[in-house]
Amino acid sequence: MELSNNQVIQLRNGKCGVVASFNDKPFQLVFDSFTTPIGRYNAELKNKNANYDIVKVFDGSKVENVLDVFKKKFNTDDLTLVWESNQ
């Protein structure tokens, strides 16, 4: 799975974040309290620490305010699921 602009991601630990881009190329994952380079994830969107594995990717084009993604009560039910881990 290759990440792209306007996507919301959900980690195994439940945190949601957004894909940040530079010159239309995704390069960082941004969360409420940290950022991480996309290069830390393999092709299956797994991290060295399983708690930070990406388990779901959503189309974030419907998100009106990107800061809402960082709220604990952010609801992904209204977003279109693009990819889900099989584990």
Label for each model-derived stretch:
Residues 16-27:
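Short beta-strand-centered aromatic/proline hotspots
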Residues 34-87:
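Intrinsically disordered, low-complexity, charged/polar segments
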Residues 1-13:
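Short coil-to-beta transition motif at edge beta-strands of beta-rich domains
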Residues 13-18, 78:
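Short small/polar-residue motifs
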Residues 28-32:
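SH3/SH3-like beta-barrel fold
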Residues 6, 26, 54:
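Exposed beta-strand and adjacent loop surfaces of beta-rich binding modules
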Residues 9-10, 20, 57:
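Short aromatic-centered micro-motifs
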